[in-house]
Amino acid sequence: MVWLEQPDDFAKPWKLRRIGTHDPDALTGLNFADIDGDGDQDIITGGYSQAPRDHDGDEVTRDGHLGRLAWFANPGDPTAAWTRHDISRRKRGMFDKFLPRDMDGDGDVDFVSTRGNSAPYDGVFWLEQVRTAEPVASFERAREVDSVEMPLPTRER
């Protein structure tokens, strides 16, 4: 994922700025919001799984294309590296639409999102942001049963 910086002089080429990657997972959707509350635009992203749509089989392993949710923290400096924060990675699902809203009125941005291609788990879901002094990996699912949670790949490409 990259962004293009428009130069002040229209005769000059645009600058290509790297943000990050979901590799090996396919990036299918994104949206912008100030996720960390520092005043700049961060990016939430979703990925698309190539696993079967109707079961959590062994066809796709941790190094295959899986459904991933992550967000990238904007460093504030266009030349600095963005930091990826993984939220969830599942055997089944396509996470592609993200609406930033403060759903619980606590002053931070949450996301209403959609999930598809993972019957019977398709639908609309809410990613609630809970702020802590230090980052804490936390994902509370709303269902008792869901597609298998998968670890990150053995190596990122």
Locate predicted features.
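Beta-propeller-forming repeat regions
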Residues: M1-R157
